[in-house]
């Protein structure tokens, strides 16, 4: 909720972006983020135009109804409009390497994203959460812990509500999930508490190598806020800057860990600064990777001063997010689990590692340029078979062939039917695609719903 206009707030930080009422702003890319950006700019007295390479981008009808006077450029980018702009607010779905964006930047146009607009106006502490995997779960956990502790927290960003729509004078805390794409185009944002949960290859179609992807994630640690570091991940641990305040979490029990998993009175417990918090088997979300997520959430919640009993209550009751290790059905002694959000190799490995017994894996889709070879060790240990679909299913097949039996299919119906045919009592059929969904589906949610509906139809 944007409750002030720029002329009513002389201390507003738009000057940091060189923005004033004479600025010629183009919002590049519509969708949820672009629409929220237009709403924010207009509320604060700025004129803007919208440009999108798609003829019918998401949010178009809402934009036309709410702001019929905003100029629209759909289809090919308008070079003349770009040449006249002073500022480009680029939505995260667009690569900064696009020729038109590079040319604008070369000509002195200020290029940034919604995160820097947020940084100009935020007036309450901010928690920033990023990582290859687990960030939505940790963001949700921290938001629920804040609520349980009686803190008015606004939760969103890359998850749910766009961050500019969260801005509200009543908010006592902001909890943001941030993607590498949001971070890479920010120069101003600094969080009070920030974490990188883990680094594994993702979006390799947008980054030349893993180091570049990790560098984009590292930007969440700009400023002097508290660093929450996953000590089990060497790439994350190496992000520590001497002199910065930091706490560390991990699934080991080393002295360097502030938040850890350790045995106490014969059980595995989550420890917070050496104090037993709750038994690991009482954390409702299952999987070893989710214990790491729980520790990260506790570390952040501690930094925010939340009551620990509030944290424990959330960990005992939070069932997890849809399409993330979500139980669908037990049929003939076989469990069917939907982890459609496992859109990269690291997430697939984490899902497999957290399951007991043999697994029939359904994988494939848009691999985003990933190297699937790191699947081999866990596949050899865990898989009874792999059922492969989608555009890059053949690439996974090439990697796993000779390691485990593989089956190639075209549709989710064929995939579930094939998996049911090879699964044995006590096995798990797991949808953990290691790929994005856009080659066959609108998004990972639609893919997960298709899996769940197909499983139930075959019951």
Swiss-Prot record:
It is found in: Cytoplasm. Transmembrane segments: none annotated. It catalyses: UDP-N-acetyl-alpha-D-muramoyl-L-alanine + D-glutamate + ATP = UDP-N-acetyl-alpha-D-muramoyl-L-alanyl-D-glutamate + ADP + phosphate + H(+). It comes from the Bacteria. HAMAP family: MurD (MF_00639). Cell wall formation. Catalyzes the addition of glutamate to the nucleotide precursor UDP-N-acetylmuramoyl-L-alanine (UMA). Belongs to the MurCDEF family. This is UDP-N-acetylmuramoylalanine--D-glutamate ligase. The lineage of its organism: Bacteria, Pseudomonadati, Pseudomonadota, Gammaproteobacteria, Methylococcales.
